[in-house]
């Protein structure tokens, strides 16, 4: 299959997001699509797969003009899109999620459970994963849910597969399994559109790379004929002098301390963070890092242990109590737990600090709007009108809104779980700079990240977890990838 997208433009009201795009996609090729959040990558692929129409332009498939009125039509034609944010129903089982809208029935009109199970297990086998079919999908980790999204696409007869940040929540082993599947699909003649911000993946897996910026295509090249510096410069329109900005904050006394904390999937976790310090938490998926942070914030119940702020023990049994104590928590799954997508930017940003803008029982609209606009300007949130629905923002800008929400409470401690997941290189640097500014003000920061270069580049100290326990601590000077991975896998 050959796809030619010609002169594609798209506007939402007065906001032009794509302008005169020409793009060719070919079966049997892996084609990377790169660009900052808001560059138009996902919008372009949504037009291809029928989620919404182009304002102008034409799509040719094997020389014939064709458009799809919805994604299901595109899937039936052999074009599938795995979105960055997972399209799952938490209460339904894995099997029900896999076959939702594509149920297989017997000649009597009943669900063919046997055949659906067989096909599901075949898809999992190709991915190299083992996931129970009869448990609610909401009980699974983000990484496992992502693998199920990928497995869905394998249930169809594929010609073109679009993947938007498919490895964002995957372990190294799951990523290697995914690459194996991608290479296998390529050998079968399937074309892959691979949207990613991860340079190492682009150079490892793709044949061609197209860079987008501000709704236009900047360049298309064979991947082997370019390099990461060139791609970054084309993506952001400027040279990034240092990927991780230099940190100048003075580290003060201990401000936040956790002692012998035990929960459902971890035990005896102890650590401390000083004023102005960024403490990184590393480990493999399933090591228990997120569970520790959720327990500290009162989302999950603790079994035992103590939490102190400024040497005073505090009791937290709910997120509202955590917020009152001055703890901010950016969760790893922003759309389910960090944002209300139907609310506008202002309402999302002021959710935890509503009382701060209330006088005599009345909400001070003027003061809150001014405050929110300052945050929008400071965080460079694109299309950032306070009244704009958060669901209309790109992933990177949504992440900035969540960050702004917690900055608004003037936190005594800030916990960030995968703060740059699915965020482009330019927005990542802006988030790092913001973290440094908060540290300069003395805010202690705990950062959970599966991005090892990020852990090494941003953290003052690093705690490593393995199978629910702290397996080691490393200073910034002594830490390197080998030492972190050794501790993450249970070594000493």
Curated annotation (Swiss-Prot):
Gene3D superfamilies: P-loop containing nucleotide triphosphate hydrolases (3.40.50.300). Residues 3-239, 238-492 form the ABC transporter domain. Its EC number is 7.5.2.7. One of its GO terms (cellular component) is plasma membrane. InterPro entries: AAA+_ATPase, ABC_carbohydrate_import_ATPase, ABC_transporter-like_ATP-bd, ABC_transporter-like_CS, P-loop_NTPase. GO terms for molecular function: ABC-type D-ribose transporter activity; ATP binding; ATP hydrolysis activity. The keyword Ribosomal protein does not apply. It comes from the Bacteria. Part of the ABC transporter complex RbsABC involved in ribose import. Responsible for energy coupling to the transport system. This is Ribose import ATP-binding protein RbsA. It comes from Streptococcus agalactiae serotype Ia (strain ATCC 27591 / A909 / CDC SS700). The lineage of its organism: Bacteria, Bacillati, Bacillota, Bacilli, Lactobacillales.
